[in-house]
């Protein structure tokens, strides 16, 4: 456990050092964060235009919560970058084992994702005139954290595709996030989709967690909310298992044939 905590700590230090080469706190706050707030605002106003106040709240809540997924899946870029700059083999030979190091490579995005979603949760509803039932709405915070964790596992699993097929990391990232945003109940209920698609989206992160957030806001029974949280946790665990298997096979194959080398 101590070694895992050390890896988490050092991964965060490395991740934020990497981010500091791109962002200052000002450019992150007034550039990236404002961009995310504008994105959520755009969809909320679009919901108001095509519907009513209830539609606007539905869309706003969905787009605030999904920001956590957006940032968590950026781990795809972080992991693909290790291959591009030639450091992937070094991660594979770490004394603590390659899996914790790989899974920790993008942890900084979980911190920024949680920050972005919570800032949006507190700022956008009053600014846009969308009332939330405070203090009950505060219970959404730990649910967003769970969604963030399951989305990070989803991103780690899909990073395996980007590590095997060089140059596709941005395509993988945008498809991963776009699929969740389109079919995961963010802007329209999952029930609008055909039955086979409704079944398929249950394996995506966000779907059950977002339903739990909506249930909290609507005063749903605690048992109903807890079942949804359990489903979200199960989905996240499944994606972490896929990520672990994918990375194990990647490293095993790379050790045999030397394919972990520099991307060129």
PLM feature spans:
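Hydrophobic transmembrane alpha-helices and immediately adjacent juxtamembrane helices
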Residues: 1-264
């Amino acid at each position: 456990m101590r070694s895992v905590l050390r890896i988490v700590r050092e991964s965060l230090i490395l991740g934020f050092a990497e981010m500091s080469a791109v962002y200052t706190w000002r450019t992150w706050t007034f550039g990236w964060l404002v961009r995310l707030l504008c994105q959520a605002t755009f969809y909320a106003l679009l919901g108001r235009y095509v519907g009513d106040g209830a539609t606007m709240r539905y869309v706003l809540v969905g787009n605030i919560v999904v920001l956590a997924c957006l940032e968590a899946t950026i781990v795809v870029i972080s992991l693909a970058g290790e291959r591009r700059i030639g450091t992937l083999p070094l991660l594979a030979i770490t004394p603590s084992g390659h899996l914790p190091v790989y899974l920790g490579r993008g942890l900084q995005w979980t911190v920024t994702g949680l920050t972005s979603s919570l800032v949006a949760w507190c700022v956008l509803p009053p600014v846009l005139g969308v009332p939330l039932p405070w203090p009950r709405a505060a219970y959404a915070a730990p649910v967003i954290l769970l969604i963030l964790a399951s989305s990070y596992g989803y991103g780690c699993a899909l990073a395996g595709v980007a590590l095997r097929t060089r140059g596709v990391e941005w395509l993988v990232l945008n498809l991963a996030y776009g699929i969740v945003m389109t079919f995961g109940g963010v802007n329209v209920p999952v029930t609008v989709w055909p039955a086979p698609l409704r079944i398929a989206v249950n394996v995506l992160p966000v779907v059950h967690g977002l339903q739990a957030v909506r249930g909290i806001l609507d005063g749903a029974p605690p048992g109903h909310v807890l079942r949804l949280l359990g489903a979200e946790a199960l989905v996240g665990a499944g994606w972490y298992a896929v990520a672990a298997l994918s990375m194990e096979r990647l490293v095993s194959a790379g050790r045999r044939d030397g394919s972990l080398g520099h991307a060129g």
